[in-house]
Amino acid sequence: MDLVFRPERYPFLTQDLPGVGGEIRVEPEDFQVEEVPAYLPKGEGEHLYLLLEKEGRTTREVLEFLRDEVGVPEKEIGVAGLKDKRAKTRQWFSIPRKYEDALCLLENLQGVRLLAADLHTNKLRTGHLKGNRFHILIRRPKGGVAEAEAVLKRLAEKGVPNYYGPQRFGLGGLNPVRGYKLVKEGKGRGSPWLKRFLIGSLQSLLFNDWVALRMALGLYDRVVPGDWAKKHATGGEFLVEDPGEAERALRLEISATGPLFGKKYPEAQGEARAIEDEVLARYGLKREEFRARRGARRPIRVPLAEWKVEEAPEGLWLSFFLPKGSYATSLLREVMKVEALDHLEAEPAPEDAEGL
């Protein structure tokens, strides 16, 4: 029974296509992320939205500065998602309008720049984003534009495997082991947030195993009766009863969803449920052992949009858009076929915290 997260245990969708190799995040500006908001501020209201560009700073560090130096109570600071430290990122924050005069203090926070500010009627909430645009440099690649484009074309046709990335599993990928102990014993040291996060790591490992099993069974881009499927255009979920829905899955209009086991999530039926049970049985786990968690369903794949590859003297630039909750590393591992990139440190994004 191996509960340690190891990226090599998960198959590539593009196994038959060569990777380009190379390195990422040699410099922070090699990894650029732009948050795409679910909505823009209206220009009126009691909440001030701030578009910040940061480099070499975690989102948490910015939150703490707004709290400690600007004086905003932490519960009144809004953020849609967390962004990596070793990257150049643009994201929105919100604070109450009454703190507007203190924003000049942001000039004292090295690595952070205020790009825009506007008013809105509500606080920015976790998950209030469409997704993220990425602009990533692969340095010293062995392959070229043609190899990268072949992989991205396949991913655009079939969808990007929605594996959880290394951010979810902690140093050495050991958090699922700690989460398993909490599930089995029902107690342990640490704050409630830490316990939720550790059990969330176990939920995520089980989900990744489910994705890999569906691939092995030839059901990655299929749905079967009993599946809960997600409509990519609207986000709605429904129970698959008509075998004819398989055609919509092949067109990437819908995708099967996998479980983040808990007490409040739609449960699969029939063959689809049996696949989930097989993953649980590997570790001697039962559904009822996750009743302390909320639970959710997560699509097996996500659409890839706005993708492009450009050659530069320093390497290959990849540009693409992914929906919220998905991981750029899941795409990069397909393009590069280099597992070492999955061990990069990054910050877990709260929009990925469904089911905790």
Curated annotation (Swiss-Prot):
Gene label: truD
CDD domains according to UniProt: PseudoU_synth_EcTruD
Record's GO cellular component terms: cytosol
Pfam families xref list: TruD
Function: Responsible for synthesis of pseudouridine from uracil-13 in transfer RNAs.
Record's keyword terms, sorted: Isomerase, tRNA processing
Domain of life where this protein originates: Bacteria
UniProt-listed Enzyme Commission number(s): 5.4.99.27
Assigned protein family: Belongs to the pseudouridine synthase TruD family.
An example molecular function term from Gene Ontology annotations: RNA binding
Entry-linked SUPFAM superfamilies: Pseudouridine synthase
UniProt-recorded name of the protein: tRNA pseudouridine synthase D
Residue ranges constituting the TRUD domain according to the UniProt record: 159-302
Record's catalysed reaction(s): uridine(13) in tRNA = pseudouridine(13) in tRNA
Active site positions: D84 (nucleophile)
Gene Ontology process terms (BP): tRNA pseudouridine synthesis
